[in-house]
Design a protein with these regions (language model features):
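Short S/T/G/P-rich N-terminal loop/turn motif that feeds into the first structured element of a domain
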Residues: 1-66, 78-81, 103-115
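Ligand-binding pocket scaffold of soluble enzyme catalytic domains
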Residues: 70
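An amphipathic, aromatic/His-enriched active-site/gating alpha helix that lines ligand/cofactor pockets
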Residues: 76-104
Length: 115
């Protein structure tokens, strides 16, 4: 498994509760994996300026054709705003038929946003 460094957002980690989101995308065909990985890296470039973003890790399990992220947010409304971001929408539309996406979101103490 490959994991990125922690990519910080503009929000401080703080002491309050946070929202954590985990995504796991498994591409149907190996040929789609490189571009899907690049799309994820492209999205991570938004992190330093995303309102409410505390940070994100990206990961890839290449033998299993899986990629994903664990992101930490100040509030669920901030996560929802990211989901509506034009670049995120564009990428999701481009890949929705090329794999299977699972995700989970939960509230957690602020320690989840600390390394």
């Amino acid at each position: 498994m490959i994991r990125s460094r922690w990519i910080p957002g503009p929000e401080p980690r703080g002491d309050g509760p946070v929202v954590v989101s985990r995504t796991d995308f498994r591409v149907h065909r190996i040929v789609d994996l490189p571009r899907a990985c690049l799309a994820g890296w492209r999205l991570s470039g938004l992190w330093p300026e995303l309102a409410g973003a505390i940070g994100v890790w990206l990961w890839a399990d290449l033998p299993r054709r899986r990629i994903g992220s664990v992101s930490v947010w100040r509030a669920e409304s901030d996560l929802r705003a990211f989901v509506r971001h034009p670049l995120h929408v564009e990428i999701m539309r481009a890949y929705r038929d090329r794999g299977t996406l699972t995700s989970a979101t939960w509230d957690s103490p602020a320690a989840a946003g600390r390394r």
